Amino acid sequence: MLERGCLRRVLFCDEGILSMETAIFEPGGYRYIRGPFQYSGGVAAEPGFSIERVRFRTPLAIEDGFLRIEAHLKKMGLPLTSFCACELRSPAPFTEEGFINFNRSYVGTLERWGIFRDDENPVARSNVCPAVGPPLEPSFQAFSYTVPVAKCDGSFVIAGSAEAPEGQGNYNARIIRLGDQSSEAMREKALYVLCVMENRMAALGKTWTNSTATTVYTVYDFHTFFEDEIVIRGAVNNGLTWVYARPPVEGLDFEMDVRGVLTELII
């Protein structure tokens, strides 16, 4: 078993009670929200560590991206286990089977790096599909890692989530207002996603006031509820980035992620 301490918190939102379990990934210097095998719900730096983010000028195909990430971490004198989050771009939404197959391939490198084990994955992730100018194959847009520091800055990254509650059954059975992109349907989808963001932050001891960046991924209009549902709760204190992209699985329409990171680089 992995040497990871666990803490269970029961969290509340408009959608009911969400039970989120956190664990510490000691080799990486961060704690994370336990999730499915392909990603964790989010990560936060442990005392003595800070999270830094690097964005590639041009997205790199997965294999090339992993090589560049490995080279960057080694240049920084950091272990591969410091890798804690990433942002991917894919050509088009996957079928459910295609998404599972991609994820199994993706976690293979994490397993070789000593991060993924026993279907436990501490790395947070978002994966979306640009509607304009998509990559030819799944690619890395950005990645995050921990660095040792004298004073913890409370940095964190919340994984991307769309409007499908995690659980049993296929995506079509879980997607909120499947096939409906009306204003009210998009509001309902967004409310669920906002709820997930807030509960994940709460599980890591964070709120919107601790965030430095909030991103929405959708190709549909959300202006009709932008102020009432997003601005009013403090989700855009540092502005909001709208990426014109679709979530990674067919049928999903609205995704978000959030981070609180003080050091960001472009390479």
Where are these regions (language model features)?
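Extreme N-terminal basic, low-complexity initiation segments
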Residues: L2-R4
